[in-house]
């Protein structure tokens, strides 16, 4: 991976032949990198800091509305060394099986949602690359950032 995005306090690496798109509003920022085929990786920063579980549930509701055949599998992943609310899903679209991977975590500045997706035929070769993009994602962490679901008082026990 030779291209690097640095801006808005975040950094990630992505392949040179992928195309980067940025959309922003006062409430959120979305950065998406598209492969030459149909796979993509997307990061959305939600500045009103909604609960990560609500964010994942909202995305899952959208997938359920769009696809009639969908399987959802909970996952355990980290973003920027923080545990996330995570899941993977498989869905059928035009006789092809697609997969999407969702990760959400809340920080003191935003809730981050990573979503990457592709057709199974592409993911045989691109899933590792999509995971490397996710693994390269970094932002300045605040000492107040907590893992989801763990109250602050657990730090003193």
Regions found by a protein language model. Name each.
Residues 2-61:
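Secretory pathway targeting signatures of secreted, lumenal, and periplasmic proteins
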Residues 39-41, 84, 109-113:
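Glycine-rich, often proline-containing surface loops adjacent to acidic residues and nearby aromatics
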Residues 60-108, 153-157:
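Signature of long, low-cysteine stretches enriched in small and polar/charged residues
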Residues 1-3, 114-115:
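Short, compositionally biased strand/turn segments
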Residues 21, 52, 96-98, 123-125, ...:
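Intrinsically disordered, low-complexity acidic/polar segments
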Residues 12, 41, 98-100, 112:
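Short beta-strand segments
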Residues 18, 113-157:
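Surface-exposed amphipathic alpha-helical segments
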């Amino acid at each position: 991976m030779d291209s690097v995005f640095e801006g808005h306090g975040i950094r990630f690496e992505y392949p040179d032949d992928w195309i980067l798109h940025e959309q922003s509003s006062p409430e959120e920022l979305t950065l998406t990198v598209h492969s030459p085929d149909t796979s993509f990786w997307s990061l959305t920063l939600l500045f009103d800091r909604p609960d990560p579980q609500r964010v994942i549930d909202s995305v899952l509701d959208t997938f359920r509305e769009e696809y009639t055949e969908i399987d959802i599998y909970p996952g355990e992943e980290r973003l920027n060394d923080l545990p996330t609310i995570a899941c993977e899903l498989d869905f059928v679209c035009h006789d092809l099986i697609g997969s999407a991977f969702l990760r959400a975590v809340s920080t003191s500045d935003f809730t981050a949602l990573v979503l990457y997706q592709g057709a199974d035929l592409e993911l045989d070769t691109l899933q590792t690359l999509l995971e490397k993009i996710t693994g390269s994602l970094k932002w300045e962490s605040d000492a107040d950032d907590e893992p989801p679901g763990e109250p602050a008082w657990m730090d003193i026990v």
